[in-house]
Regions:
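Short amphipathic alpha-helix adjacent to the substrate-entry channel of hydrolases
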Residues: 109-127
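Alpha/beta-hydrolase fold nucleophile elbow
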Residues: 153-164
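Short glycine-enriched nucleophile-adjacent loop
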Residues: 20, 167-179
């Protein structure tokens, strides 16, 4: 466990954190940050990248002459073990990595589907969402996935992409990793109820945003998606598909490929 403590934290005072840390019986390390309270600490995030270097990478029994297929496991903020599918071009060259998130109620995309990005010279790091997690846990898992992807030696930078819930997580990951995420694409992001924070994350984006909206979506209503898109002040573009519901849109996926790789 890597444990960080802001010495000016009044929400969870250092003395309270002492008890938690002292009760840990596993291998552990603690870092103190004078002058920081209960807030995000960039220096600690940077330490996490090194900490995640030990994330196990297991080869898969699938291969092609141009791509390597692997499963990466890493630890979530709450201690749970998370898994991601990782596909990268053969070799040790550092390449842009598509940080991919899937929708609620749908599985992670198939290996061969994601290989399309390898043809463009990109890697793919696709998180397998926890089925029963609440919104805040899902947001935290997205950040953990971004850190794990960044810890891989062949990652140059990140491109966030997702549909539905995945679109929301892509926007959140891009907002929280502005120095590493260079583009973000989201289709029908969930943006009401527990996911209303999506608009706040959109307002923090500095990378270009591509957004797709289904005109008949009742799960992520177009009016709610308007709030998300309007909140973004970055370079942005949106496509509206009037006759579609909350479903996969092949035409938008073509737009995503062109957005990520302008030569497509």
């Amino acid at each position: 466990v890597l444990f960080g403590t802001g010495l000016a934290d009044v929400v969870c005072p250092p003395i309270t954190q002492d008890a938690v840390y002292n009760n840990l019986t596993c291998k552990k390390r603690r870092e103190f940050f004078p002058g920081f309270g209960h807030e995000e600490i960039q220096a600690f995030d940077d330490m996490l990248l090194t900490f995640f270097d030990d994330a196990p990478v297991v080869p898969c029994p699938v291969s092609t002459p141009t791509a390597e297929y692997q499963t990466v496991t890493f630890v979530a903020d709450d201690g749970a073990t998370l898994s991601a599918r990782y596909i990268r071009p053969v070799g040790n060259k550092r390449v842009p990595t598509v940080l991919m998130f899937h929708d609620a109620g749908r599985p992670v995309r198939g290996w061969h589907h994601m290989t399309r990005f390898v043809a463009l010279g990109y890697a793919v790091f696709a998180l397998e969402n926890r089925a029963e997690a609440d919104a805040q846990t899902q947001f935290a898992d997205a950040q953990a996935a971004a850190r794990a992807a960044l810890s891989l030696p062949t990652t140059l930078n990140l491109i966030a992409w997702g549909e539905g819930l995945g679109g929301t997580l892509a926007i959140a990951a891009a907002a929280k990793q502005p120095q590493h995420v260079v583009k973000c694409a989201a289709q029908n992001p969930l943006c009401t109820g527990a996911y209303a924070d999506c608009a706040q994350y959109a307002a923090q984006l500095i990378c270009p945003l591509l957004m797709g909206t289904s005109g008949m979506d009742t799960i992520a209503p177009p009016d709610a998606q308007n709030v998300v898109y309007d909140a973004a002040s970055c370079d942005k573009k949106r496509y509206i598909y009037v006759k579609y519901i909350h479903e996969r849109i092949n035409a938008f996926e073509d737009r995503v490929l062109a957005f990520f790789h302008p030569m497509v």
